[in-house]
Amino acid sequence: MLIYGRNPVLEALRDNQVTRLFVADGIDSKFTKELEAAAFESGVELEWYARIELDRAVKTTNHQGVIAEIPETDFAEIDDALELAAARGEELFLVLLDGITDPHNFGAIIRSAEVLGAHGVVIEERRSAPLSPVVVKTAAGATAHLPVVQVKNLPRLIDELKEDGVWVYGAAGEATAKLEQLDYNRPLALVIGSEGDGLRRLVREKCDELVSIPTKGKVQSLNASVAAAILIHTVISSRERKKK
């Protein structure tokens, strides 16, 4: 698979995932030095091409002058998220995506989840954008550090999580429960629905609680990735306060 963009490529190099590295002639020297250092550590040589050749390879000009070839991305397992939570000594926190089909939203949610401290992002096989180069670029390297899990049946996973003591909160604009009213200091899965349709009825019914983000403006709703970032930050902030 080809990935592109400076942050995703650097993270892939640092994670020893890159098999070939394609660089555009004339990119700035500061980034070239950083790229050369990371490539040297990873044992990969830089291959120089005219920028138009890179444009053709990924069918976009938005590659920032660097493309990397990596093995096809394998999805993680739920156990990988459990292990990450255990390694940090934290209660499990998963972000479940129900129908996020826009790759930019998907990538942005992965990025927010990794940066803010969630332990994994879970998607359903037939109701999600694929883990594509656009997603990887938008995630800005976060896919190298955060388990991204794909399941066949999200409602079934929710049942299994609940059986294991995980609480499931769903984001819903019409929910009466507000952010500050819920307990986040427990094993938790947060479900984010699509911008157009929200959560499916079956997913909604399986949630222990539905939560909304208070708004004051005239626009009805937030972008899915923005809403996810706010909710993820709320969970992590609540847990940090609990530690003090």
Description of each model-found segment:
Residues 11, 17, 83-177:
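RNA substrate-binding interface of SAM-dependent RNA methyltransferases
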Residues 10, 137-142, 201-244:
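Structured adenosyl-cofactor binding patch, chiefly the S-adenosyl-L-methionine
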Residues 40, 158-162, 236:
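Surface-exposed amphipathic alpha-helices with a cationic face
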Residues 31, 128-134, 197-206:
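Short, glycine/polar-rich helix-capping loops at beta-to-alpha or helix-loop-helix junctions
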Residues 169-224:
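Active-site/ligand-binding-proximal alpha/beta "capping" segment
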Residues 24, 50, 71, 98, ...:
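Short beta->alpha connector loops at strand-helix junctions that form conserved
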Residues 1-84:
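N-terminal positively charged helical leader segments and presequences
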